[in-house]
C-alpha cells in the first residue's frame, strides 16, 4: 500500500496523453487521426479507469489507516526564494478523486454516442481529458501555488467546453460570461493567497494553518487584515461554485453540449469551490466572521437558486438552478462546521445530478427528431409532455434522480440533505426555517420539471396550444406566459442520416445518427401546424450506449447513501464515510453521544419528508390534473372564476413568475450597472483620448508646421536669415533665464 502513496503523483498525469496526442495528430496526421477517432475515446476511458482504480485503492487505505501522505520537492529560485511542489493525499483527496473519475468515465462513454454526429468529436474528447487532468491536479495539490495553477486550468477548460459550439453567438457569449465572472473570484483568491503568504511566509497548507493559528491566538497579527484575506480567499469558491452574487454564469453554461453540463454541474467544476472551502476549513474556523459569511452566502444561495428554478422553461436551466441551490446547502454546511454532512451531500448530489443531466440529454436527443436541431425548442419543457410513453427507460431513470434530489427516503440525497437540515437547527432557527422551506421548493420545481416533461399529452402537437388560453388554472400549470418569440406554423424536421456500416459510433449500438453539416443539404419533411390531429412521428428512446450509462447511474442514488448510514447501533461513527473522514471537523456534534438511537434516526426526518411530500403534491395538483379529464370538472371552473381575490392572486403569481423567469433581475442589474457602465466609461475614455490627448499632440504638430511655413515665407529661404533668427532666439532665451534665476 505504501507504493500506492509513492506513485500518487501520476494521478493528474495519466489523462494528459490524450489531449497532447490528439493535438499532435490533428496537426501532423489529420486524416489518420480523424479516421481513428473512436480509438481516442477508448483511450480516454481506459486512462481515466486506471486513475479510478488507483483512487479506490487510496480510499481503502484511508479507511484502514486514516493516514495523510504528503510528498514535497523544493524548487530553489534564489537563496531567499524557493517553492515546494508535491502532492497531498488525505480522505478529501480520495473522495474527490473517486467522484471525478467515476462520473468522468460515465460521461465519456455517454459522449461517445451523444457527440458522434459532431464534427468536433476529437476536440471534445481532448477538452474533456484535459479537464479531468486539471481537476485531478487540483484535488491532489499540496500548496496554494499548485492549487491556483490548476484552478486556472479548470477555468480555462470550462471556457473551452461551454463555448464548444463557438459559432453560435449565444454559446460564445455564455463562455465569455463564465470566464469573466470567474475572473472576479479568481482575482480575489489570488489577493488572499498573497496576503496569507505575507503573513505566514508559507504556501503549504499544513504549515500555513499552524502558523496562522499561533499568530491569531498570540495576538501577533491584525485580525482585520486576516479576516479580509479570508474573505478574498472565499471569493474564488463563490464564483467557481456559482454562489450568490457570482452565480450568473451557471445557467448560461447550459449552451454547451449536455455531457458538459453533466460534468460541470455534477462532480467537477462547481464542486471545486466546495472542495477548496473544505480544504481551507481549518483556516476559516479560527476566523469566526469568515464562517458566518460562508453560512450566510450558503443560505442565500439555497433559497435564491430554488426560487429561480420555479419558472424556467428550459429543462437544462431548471436543473442548473437546482445545482446552484444544492451547492448552497453544501456551503451552508461548511459554514456551520458540519464538514461530514457537506461532503456527504457533495457525493450524493453528484451522482443524482449527473443522472438528471444525462437523462435530459436523452430527452433532448429524442426531441431533436421532432423539432430539429433548435435548442430553444428541443430543450423547452412547454413543448414536451407525454414522453413517458415514448421514452420509458429515460423516464424511469429521470424519476429516480428526481426522487433522490427531492430527498425521498431511502434514496441517497435523503440521508445527506436531512443531516444538513438537522444541523441547521443547532446553528440558527432562522437558517433552519429557510432551509426546510427550500426543501419543499426543491420537491416542487423538480416535480414540475418531471410532470411537464413526461406527463400529459405531447404538447408539441397539442391543438391550439399557446399561452393565449384564458383559463387561469391552465396558465398556472405552465406559469402562464408565452414565449417572447411567436411559434411558426411550420417546422422542418431534420432527417437523421446514418453512417456507413463499417463506422460504429458507440460501444453498444450498431448504428448511430449523424446530423448533416448544413441545413441546405438536409432532406426535410414539413410538419403540420399545431392544429393538426397528428404529427409525422413521436420521440423515440435513445441508443443503447446512452441508456446503459443512465442505468449504471441509477444504481448510485439507490445505494450510495449507504456509506453514511451507521452500521452499528453502539457506535455513532460506524458508517463508512465517518471512518474515512476520522478525525474530521464537526463543530455542531462534538458533544454527541457515542451510540445511535434508531428512534431519533426515524423521528428527525419526519418534518423534512413531510414538507417534501407537500411540495410534490402541490406540483402534482398544479400541473398534472390539467392534462386529464379533471380539467372539465366544475370544481376547477369554480376556482377559475374571476373575482377581486382571484385577480389579486393572479397578480401575485404573475409577479413571482416574472421575478423567477427574469432571474430576479440580477442579470439585468449587472448589465445596466457593470457592463453598460464599463462600456460607457470606455467610450468616454476613448473620446477623451481622441479629442484631448490626440488633439494636443496633433495641435503641437500643426502649430509647428505653420510656424515653420511662416518663417520660411518671411525669410525667403535664405540661410543667413535663419542663422540670424536662431541667434536672436538663443539670446532672448539666455536673457530670460538670467532674469528668471538671478533677479
From Swiss-Prot:
Keywords attached to this entry: Chloroplast, Membrane, NAD, NADP, Plastid, Plastoquinone, Quinone, Thylakoid, Translocase, Transmembrane, Transmembrane helix, Transport
Transmembrane segments: 9-29, 40-60, 89-109, 125-145, 147-167, 185-205, 219-239, 258-278, 280-300, 327-347, 354-374, 396-416, 425-445, 546-566, 607-627, 721-741
Lineage of the species this protein comes from: Eukaryota, Viridiplantae, Streptophyta, Embryophyta, Tracheophyta
Coiled-coil segments on the chain, per record: none
Molecular function terms from GO: NADH dehydrogenase (ubiquinone) activity; quinone binding
Source organism, top-level taxon: Eukaryota
Protein name: NAD(P)H-quinone oxidoreductase subunit 5, chloroplastic
Catalytic activity field: a plastoquinone + NADH + (n+1) H(+)(in) = a plastoquinol + NAD(+) + n H(+)(out); a plastoquinone + NADPH + (n+1) H(+)(in) = a plastoquinol + NADP(+) + n H(+)(out)
Pfam families from the UniProt entry: Proton_antipo_C (PF01010), Proton_antipo_M (PF00361), Proton_antipo_N (PF00662)
Subunit structure: NDH is composed of at least 16 different subunits, 5 of which are encoded in the nucleus.
Amino acid at each position: 500500500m505504501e507504493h500506492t502513496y509513492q506513485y500518487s503523483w501520476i494521478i493528474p498525469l495519466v489523462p494528459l496523453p490524450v489531449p497532447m496526442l490528439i493535438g499532435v495528430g490533428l496537426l501532423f496526421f489529420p486524416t489518420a487521426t480523424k479516421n481513428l477517432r473512436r480509438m481516442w475515446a477508448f483511450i480516454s476511458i481506459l486512462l481515466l479507469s486506471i486513475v479510478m482504480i488507483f483512487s479506490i485503492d487510496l480510499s481503502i487505505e484511508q479507511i484502514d489507516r486514516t493516514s495523510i501522505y504528503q510528498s514535497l520537492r523544493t524548487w530553489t529560485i534564489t537563496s531567499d526564494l524557493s517553492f515546494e511542489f508535491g502532492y497531498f493525499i488525505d480522505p478529501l483527496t480520495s473522495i474527490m478523486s473517486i467522484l471525478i473519475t467515476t462520473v468522468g468515465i460515465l460521461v465519456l462513454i455517454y459522449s461517445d454516442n451523444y457527440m458522434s454526429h459532431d464534427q468536433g468529436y476529437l476536440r471534445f474528447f481532448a477538452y474533456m481529458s484535459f479537464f479531468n487532468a486539471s481537476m485531478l491536479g487540483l484535488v491532489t495539490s499540496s500548496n496554494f501555488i499548485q492549487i491556483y495553477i490548476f484552478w486556472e486550468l479548470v477555468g480555462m477548460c470550462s471556457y473551452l467546453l461551454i463555448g464548444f459550439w463557438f459559432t453560435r453567438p449565444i454559446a460564445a457569449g455564455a463562455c465569455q460570461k463564465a470566464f469573466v465572472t470567474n475572473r472576479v473570484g479568481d482575482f480575489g483568491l489570488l489577493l488572499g493567497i498573497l496576503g496569507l503568504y505575507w503573513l505566514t511566509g508559507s504556501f503549504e497548507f499544513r504549515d500555513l494553518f499552524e502558523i496562522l493559528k499561533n499568530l491569531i491566538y498570540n495576538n501577533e497579527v491584525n485580525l482585520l487584515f486576516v479576516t479580509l484575506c479570508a474573505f478574498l480567499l472565499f471569493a474564488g469558491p463563490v464564483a467557481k461554485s456559482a454562489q450568490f452574487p457570482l452565480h450568473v454564469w451557471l445557467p448560461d453554461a447550459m449552451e454547451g453540449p449536455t455531457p458538459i453540463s453533466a460534468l460541470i454541474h455534477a462532480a467537477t467544476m462547481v464542486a471545486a469551490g466546495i472542495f477548496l472551502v473544505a480544504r481551507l476549513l481549518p483556516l476559516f474556523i479560527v476566523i469566526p466572521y469568515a464562517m458566518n459569511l460562508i453560512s450566510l452566502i450558503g443560505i442565500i444561495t439555497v433559497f435564491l437558486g430554488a426560487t429561480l428554478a420555479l419558472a424556467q422553461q428550459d429543462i437544462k436551466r431548471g436543473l442548473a438552478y437546482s445545482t446552484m441551490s444544492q451547492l448552497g446547502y453544501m456551503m451552508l454546511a461548511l459554514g456551520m462546521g458540519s464538514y461530514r454532512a457537506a461532503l456527504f451531500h457533495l457525493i450524493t448530489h453528484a451522482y443524482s445530478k449527473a443522472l438528471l443531466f444525462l437523462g435530459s440529454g436523452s430527452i433532448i436527443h429524442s426531441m431533436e427528431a421532432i423539432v430539429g436541431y433548435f435548442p430553444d425548442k428541443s430543450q423547452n419543457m412547454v413543448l414536451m409532455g407525454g414522453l413517458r410513453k415514448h421514452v420509458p427507460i429515460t423516464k424511469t431513470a429521470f424519476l429516480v434522480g428526481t426522487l433522490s434530489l427531492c430527498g425521498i427516503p431511502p434514496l441517497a440525497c435523503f440521508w445527506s440533505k436531512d443531516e444538513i437540515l438537522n444541523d441547521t437547527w443547532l446553528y440558527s432557527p432562522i437558517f433552519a426555517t429557510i432551509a426546510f422551506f427550500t426543501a419543499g421548493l426543491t420537491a416542487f420545481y423538480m416535480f414540475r420539471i418531471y410532470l411537464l416533461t413526461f406527463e400529459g399529452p405531447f404538447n408539441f402537437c397539442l391543438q391550439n396550444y399557446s399561452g393565449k388560453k384564458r383559463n387561469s388554472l391552465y396558465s398556472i400549470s405552465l406559469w402562464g406566459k408565452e414565449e417572447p418569440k411567436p411559434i411558426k406554423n411550420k417546422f422542418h424536421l431534420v432527417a437523421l442520416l446514418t453512417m456507413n456500416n463499417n463506422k460504429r459510433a458507440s460501444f453498444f449500438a450498431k448504428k448511430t445518427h449523424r446530423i448533416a453539416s448544413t441545413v441546405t443539404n438536409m432532406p426535410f419533411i414539413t410538419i403540420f401546424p399545431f392544429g393538426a390531429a397528428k404529427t409525422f412521428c413521436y420521440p423515440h428512446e435513445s441508443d443503447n450506449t446512452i441508456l446503459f450509462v443512465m442505468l449504471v447511474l441509477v444504481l448510485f442514488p439507490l445505494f450510495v447513501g449507504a456509506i453514511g448510514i451507521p452500521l452499528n447501533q453502539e457506535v455513532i461513527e460506524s458508517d463508512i464515510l465517518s471512518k474515512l473522514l476520522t478525525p474530521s471537523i464537526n463543530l455542531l456534534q462534538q458533544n454527541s453521544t457515542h451510540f445511535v438511537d434508531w428512534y431519533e434516526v426515524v423521528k428527525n426526518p419526519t418534518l423534512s419528508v413531510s414538507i417534501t411530500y407537500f411540495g410534490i403534491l402541490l406540483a402534482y395538483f398544479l400541473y398534472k390534473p390539467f392534462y386529464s379529464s379533471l380539467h372539465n370538472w366544475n370544481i376547477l371552473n369554480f376556482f377559475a372564476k374571476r373575482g377581486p381575490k382571484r385577480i389579486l392572486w393572479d397578480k401575485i403569481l404573475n409577479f413571482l413568475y416574472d421575478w423567477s423567469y427574469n432571474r430576479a433581475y440580477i442579470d439585468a442589474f449587472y448589465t445596466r450597472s457593470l457592463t453598460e457602465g464599463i462600456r460607457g466609461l470606455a467610450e468616454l475614455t476613448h473620446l477623451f483620448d481622441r479629442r484631448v490627448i490626440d488633439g494636443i499632440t496633433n495641435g503641437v504638430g500643426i502649430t509647428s508646421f505653420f510656424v515653420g511655413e511662416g518663417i520660411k515665407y518671411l525669410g525667403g529661404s535664405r540661410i543667413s536669415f535663419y542663422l540670424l533668427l536662431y541667434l536672436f532666439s538663443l539670446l532672448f532665451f539666455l536673457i530670460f533665464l538670467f532674469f528668471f534665476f538671478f533677479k
